[in-house]
Design a protein with these regions (language model features):
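Alpha/beta-hydrolase fold catalytic core
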Residues: 307-315
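Extreme N-terminal starter segment of soluble prokaryotic enzymes
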Residues: 1-4
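N-terminal Rossmann-like or analogous alpha/beta NTP/dinucleotide-binding catalytic cores
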Residues: 12-19, 23-153, 157-158, 170
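Glycine-rich, Lys/Arg-enriched anion-binding loops that position phosphate/diphosphate groups
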Residues: 123-160, 167-306
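Cofactor-binding loop segments of dinucleotide-utilizing enzymes, especially the Rossmann-like FAD-
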Residues: 9, 38, 189
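Structural motif
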Residues: 159-164, 200-201, 315-326
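Conserved small/polar residues in nucleotide/adenosyl-binding loops
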Residues: 336-341
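Short, hydrophobic/amphipathic alpha-helical patches that form generic packing surfaces
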Residues: 166-177, 325-335
Length: 341
């Protein structure tokens, strides 16, 4: 029996994810698909829009044979650590033969070549990288230009500009790092662009679906919905727009559990975060793994302007501190007392 492993977030599950499961089984010839999925927090450093058990149920209804939770320390980490944690998990299961991931380029050879360069760090590539950094380029731009120079191509941005291509490269690096016997495959992503907020026919991005669910929640703020009248509510009409975007079994779950188990948003934790930060000093904040001294001081200096969780993260942004990095750094402050010794 052959098993294909999938690394996912399903935030939320949609047609593109079902296609991923089905196509992965097809291209690998595997008999079953095993999923490693982020839990209640995702890689952007924010809560998943719905609980992990509901998302896992959707995956099981749509072709997955088993769903395992990726520990939160990896699920909310950088692309490199996210990939390393997930690949290590699949490798340690000891039953996974293939890893199949979606990419924009659908070019396994090209992705593998870049992954090998980043793993081996040949002297010529390292020289180009250091020169670019000394010239003041940001690390992503410096790395992209160094790879282009080393590989002898005019521009490799088509392989490094998309988040899914970047994750694909990190999966390939992780397979090498753990010396895994798992064989990689990639398939062309069918859904819209990662950041696309517009619903498309059949394959929409998770971002677009989250936006619609957020809008439906705002509608319900002034609506009293009961089970008997659900089909006649504005919310029912809004959610029915997803009929072509998510599998029927998932749409039924979305209708059943809206305002019961989901949606969950970053701002739902605003009071908790404000309370935690009011009880912290810069010295105590830097004990959290991803909180630098610079970020700790910015938190302290801007705390009086805290309006809500999301707004505060946006307020803390700088050229060097992206919002995603800030999200990841603050997340452990809100849910744990554990800090570095």
């Amino acid at each position: 029996m052959k098993i294909v492993g999938l690394i996912t977030e399903y935030n939320p599950f949609h047609n593109g994810h079902q296609y991923h499961i089905q196509k992965s089984l097809e291209v690998t010839g595997a008999d079953a698909a095993i999923v490693v999925m982020s839990g209640d927090y995702v890689q952007r450093g924010t809560p998943a829009i719905m609980p992990k058990h509901l998302r896992a149920e959707m995956a099981l209804k749509c072709g997955a044979c088993a769903v395992f939770e990726l520990p939160v320390c990896y699920a909310t980490a950088t692309a490199e650590l996210f990939a390393l944690g997930a690949v290590s998990f699949l490798d340690q299961l000891g039953v996974v033969d293939y890893l199949c991931f979606g990419s924009e380029c659908n070019d396994l050879d090209g992705l593998t070549k870049i992954a090998d360069i980043l793993c081996d760090e040949p002297d010529e590539y390292t020289k180009f990288l250091k020169e670019n950094l000394r010239a003041g380029m940001s690390f992503p731009a410096a790395r992209q230009d160094a790879l282009s120079s080393y590989m002898g191509i005019s521009d490799c941005s088509f392989l490094l500009s998309d988040p899914n291509n970047i994750l694909s490269i990190e999966y390939l690096k992780a397979l090498r790092r753990v010396k895994s016997r798992i064989q990689p495959f990639t398939i062309k992503r069918m859904e819209s662009d990662y950041h696309d907020q517009t619903l498309r026919s059949t394959y929409s991005s998770a971002s677009a679906i989250r936006s619609l669910l957020a809008y439906s929640s705002s509608v319900l703020q002034t609506q009293q919905v009961t089970g008997e009248t659900f089909e006649n509510t504005p919310f029912s009409s809004i959610l029915n727009e997803l009929e072509d975007q998510v599998p029927k079994s998932c749409l039924a779950l979305l209708k059943d559990y809206h305002k019961v188990l989901y949606p969950v948003y970053q701002n739902d934790f605003s009071l908790l975060m404000k309370y935690k930060l009011l009880n912290k000093t810069p010295q105590s904040l830097i004990r959290y793994m991803d909180v630098s001294e610079t970020l700790a001081n910015r938190i302290q200096n801007n705390l009086n302007d805290f309006f809500n969780y999301k707004q505060f993260c946006e307020l803390l942004k700088t050229r060097e501190l992206t919002q995603t990095r800030i999200n990841r750094a603050l997340l452990p402050v809100s849910y744990t007392h554990l800090t570095l010794p």
